[in-house]
């Protein structure tokens, strides 16, 4: 293999890695959760995806917490959260790429006793997921 051909192959591979890698990381949605369970009710939550555990959080009434969901180039992004307050334990798929792309780059959720309500994009309230 000539030096010139090897150089062009290396440059092409480098370009593709940076170009496609940059596209994958650049695409994302900020997901913001608001504790609207009720006055003086603390909301515990734990969100994760297949590959990323965001850890446990605790929100006082009306407090916000958020994360950035990177959109996959080859896969569909899904984040789910487990919520606890008083004697309740619920879970919900908080970001589903196909469902939530109407949010644009910022998806805001109001977490309520009856279920999460998406406030951006097409506003809609959802029931909690089944237990299993």
From Swiss-Prot:
Q: Which residues form a coiled coil?
A: none
Q: Its domain of life? A: Eukaryota
- InterPro entries (UniProt xref): Self-incomp_S1
Its localization reads: Secreted
Signal sequence extent: 1-26
The entry annotates sugar attachment on 87
Keywords for the protein's UniProt record, in alphabetical order: Glycoprotein, Secreted, Self-incompatibility, Signal
> Which Pfam families does the record associate with it?
Self-incomp_S1
Gene Ontology biological-process annotations: rejection of self pollen
Query: One GO CC term of this entry?
Result: extracellular region
Q: Which family does it belong to?
A: Belongs to the plant self-incompatibility (S1) protein family.
PANTHER family linked to this entry: PTHR31232, S-PROTEIN HOMOLOG 18-RELATED
Q: What is this protein called?
A: S-protein homolog 19
Q: Which gene produces this protein? A: SPH19
